[in-house]
Amino acid sequence: MIDIKLIRQDPDFVKDALKKRGEDTDIIDEILKIDSEWRSVTTELNELRAKRNDISKNVAKLKKEGKSSEANALIEEGKRIGEEIKSLEEKEKELQSKLRDLLLRVPNIPHESVPVGSDESQNVEVRRWGEPRKFDFAPLAHWDLGPAWGLMDFDRASKLSGSRFTVMYGKLARLERALINFMLDVHTREHGYTEVWVPHLVKRETITITGQLPKFEEELYLTEKDDLFLIPTAEVPLVALHSGEILEEKDLPKKYVAYTPCYRREAGSYGKDVRGMIRQHQFDKVELVWITTPERSFDDLEQLVRDAETILQRLGLPYRVVSLCTGDLGFASAKTYDIEVWLPSYNAYKEISSCSNVTDFQARRGNMRYRRRSDGKLTLVHTLNGSGIAVGRTLVAILENYQQPDGSVKVPEALVPYTGFEVIP
């Protein structure tokens, strides 16, 4: 949630930021209208409360002086003012609710370093690592390799749960688990993250903090009886861990890592990546979250990206890093880098990690602050998040990039201690 003060002071700046995102700016005028009404009602309320207090003092004084009739007249006026206050309090509450709902629907302001563009075609490549492999045979897609071994089963997954689910057996199931453990070990032992085990079901207010609600409810799985949401990413519980808390600057940054399954309805992706494991309703991911200070958050974002890149480098998978343009930024993000791994089946780079600085957008929603060492002032933290990395897509990248002419796949050297085998099947 962006600061209402910014909208009041410089609405044109906010509108320009929304235009760069390709968003409608009418909501800013609506916010200013409701905000003006709310402030007017608040001013009137304060005046009436002050008047009621004066009446109470005067009633006591008049009673002391034995002026009962005058005191009774003031009491009646006080009752009338009390009714006005009650009515205005209800109106104030209603306007506050409307204002918050509107503010929750405004995306974050893109950072000045973000390239301006309308869609992903205008994202800017930052760097590449590794070279896509040149095959001297016709490589197979993962959706052909896995089923041919009898280790990847889309048909039975569909029988169990419908489309966009996968069942894996034997060595592929073990490879998935090996990747999770490998990623967690690198991030905790080498990068200094604290591993966290989090709930996979969260409250409505929790998932509002990270920005999925209220705008994207149709993309989430909801257990209606309990009004709990299945998490679309571990970012949700990790960021909200410190909601409503005051942290000390000496304890920042906090760096958390968590493995969870993630659940997404993919409501807006009909017809995209329909084959294989690239776009699933349920997938495994290792998530990285930083809680840091405004002064260092953009430097921390660069480190977060490097931490995610390390995984791909250790696995020997070619990738590139791109800076998302304004029109492709996520709702809560001020700046995002995508890491895209090379997939031979697409003859293209495909997203495997998205790393974002959300600035104080989530902190304002969740009232997450820290006490500055210099002056003791309470300030909103900045939050960062990134995939460290998507497990299923990493498995896919290994199968496709490490396949051999005989239809087998070599396991990357870094994973052999985790798998206990060097070749699949």
From Swiss-Prot:
GO biological process terms held by the UniProt record: selenocysteine biosynthetic process; seryl-tRNA aminoacylation
Major location category of this protein: cytoplasm
Pfam families: Seryl_tRNA_N, tRNA-synt_2b
InterPro entries assigned to the protein according to its UniProt record, in alphabetical order: aa-tRNA-synt_IIb, aa-tRNA-synth_II, aa-tRNA-synth_II/BPL/LPL, Ser-tRNA-ligase_type_1, Ser-tRNA-synth_1_N, SerRS_1_N_sf, SerRS_core, tRNA-bd_arm
Binding site for L-serine: 233-235, 287, 387
Transmembrane annotation, as ranges: none
Reactions mediated catalytically: tRNA(Ser) + L-serine + ATP = L-seryl-tRNA(Ser) + AMP + diphosphate + H(+); tRNA(Sec) + L-serine + ATP = L-seryl-tRNA(Sec) + AMP + diphosphate + H(+)
The UniProt record lists the keyword Transcription regulation: no
Pathway: Aminoacyl-tRNA biosynthesis; selenocysteinyl-tRNA(Sec) biosynthesis; L-seryl-tRNA(Sec) from L-serine and tRNA(Sec): step 1/1
Keyword line: Aminoacyl-tRNA synthetase, ATP-binding, Cytoplasm, Ligase, Nucleotide-binding, Protein biosynthesis
EC number: 6.1.1.11
Gene Ontology CC entries for this record: cytoplasm
MF-aspect GO terms: ATP binding; serine-tRNA ligase activity
Subcellular location: Cytoplasm
Positions with a binding annotation for ATP: 264-266, 351-354
Family statement: Belongs to the class-II aminoacyl-tRNA synthetase family. Type-1 seryl-tRNA synthetase subfamily.
Biological role stated in the UniProt entry: Catalyzes the attachment of serine to tRNA(Ser). Is also able to aminoacylate tRNA(Sec) with serine, to form the misacylated tRNA L-seryl-tRNA(Sec), which will be further converted into selenocysteinyl-tRNA(Sec).
Free-text note on domains in this protein's UniProt record: Consists of two distinct domains, a catalytic core and a N-terminal extension that is involved in tRNA binding.
NCBIfam families according to UniProt: serS (TIGR00414)
Subunit-structure text: Homodimer. The tRNA molecule binds across the dimer.
The protein's name in its UniProt record: Serine--tRNA ligase
Organism for this UniProt entry: Thermotoga neapolitana (strain ATCC 49049 / DSM 4359 / NBRC 107923 / NS-E)
